[in-house]
Structures are given as C-alpha cells and as structure tokens.
C-alpha cells in the first residue's frame, strides 16, 4: 500500500517518500523507533495501525516530534468524507450547521471523520455514531475514551 502512496506523494506533491515497516506490535517500541528516525525525515505518514493504538501513537509522536505526523487511515478518510459533505450541502443548498449526520462505524477512520465533520460546523447534537453494538450514547459504559467523546444525546432521547 505505502509503495503506491509514495508514488502519489512524488507525482502530485514532489515529495520523496520511503516505505518503512517496523516489526513490532508494541506501541511504545513503535513510537521510540519512529522518534529516533526524526532527523532523517520531514514528515511521518502512519498507515494501517488499528485503534486504539493509532490514537496513542499519533498523539504521542505529535507531542514529541517537530515534524508533521499524519495517520492516513484516520485523516485521509476524514478529508474525503468532509469534502463529500461540503459538496452535498452545496448541491442541496443546505447549511452545514443544519444537517444531521449518521456515522455507521466507530473505528479510527469513523472517529476522525466525526471529529472533522463537527469542526466544519455540524453541531455535536446533530451527529450520531453507531458501532457493532448500536448507537453510541451518553452514559453507555462499554466504550473507550475515543468513542465516548462522540455521543450527542442520551439513548432515551433517540
């Protein structure tokens, strides 16, 4: 996957990219390895890291490093989803603050999509997120800290 993306980086942005893979499933080992390489690179594009490790790894690297860190699975997907919503609003003559959005899924990409969509002006109460169990609502006790930031209303109000 990253070899192809490296070609796109070069073709469309004239950015030289190198595909590096680390043989570890430990978040702290991964973070330390990437941080050690910082002086050699102008940016880091993370790929195929599952939640919740992707949130921890990306935030830790952003905090510790002086170069951009981008998790493609989260933010690349969110950018495309946001562009689609902006275009849909333009085509239907709606204001983004008036639309209601349902996000079906609650993985890293879905959470990043919801966060970006809200930052564009969709009110928190107009966004509903569902995972494999159902609607993520305020007070639901089986969600992690990232999912728990997403609910808009108590379940009984739905």
Language-model-detected regions and their locations in the chain:
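Hydrophobic/aromatic beta-strand patches that form the interior of the parallel beta-sheet core
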Residues: 18-20, 70, 128-130
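A glycine-rich helix N-cap at a beta->alpha junction
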Residues: 40, 46, 69-70, 120-126
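Short, ordered loop/turn segments at secondary-structure junctions
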Residues: 22-23, 48-51, 72-75, 132-134
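Glycine-rich phosphate/diphosphate-binding loop of Rossmann-like nucleotide-binding domains
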Residues: 1-13, 65, 79-158
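N-terminal ligand-binding/catalytic initiation module
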Residues: 1-67
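Gly/Ser/Thr-rich loops at beta-strand to alpha-helix junctions
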Residues: 47-54, 75-76, 106-111
């Amino acid at each position: 996957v990253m070899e192809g993306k490296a070609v796109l980086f070069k073709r469309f942005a004239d950015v030289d990219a190198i595909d590096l893979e680390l043989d570890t499933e430990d978040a702290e080992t991964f973070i330390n390895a990437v941080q050690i390489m910082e002086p050699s690179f102008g940016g880091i594009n993370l790929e195929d890291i599952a939640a919740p490790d992707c949130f921890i790894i990306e935030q830790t690297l952003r905090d510790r490093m002086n170069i951009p860190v981008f998790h493609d699975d989260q933010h690349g997907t969110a950018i495309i989803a946001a562009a689609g919503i902006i275009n849909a609003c333009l085509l239907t003559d709606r204001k983004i603050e008036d639309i209601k959005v349902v996000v079906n899924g609650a993985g890293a990409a879905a959470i990043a999509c919801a966060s970006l969509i809200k930052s564009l002006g969709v009110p928190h109460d107009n966004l509903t997120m569902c995972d494999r169990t159902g609607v993520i609502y305020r007070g639901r006790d089986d969600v992690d800290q990232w999912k728990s930031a997403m609910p808009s209303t108590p379940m009984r109000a739905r």
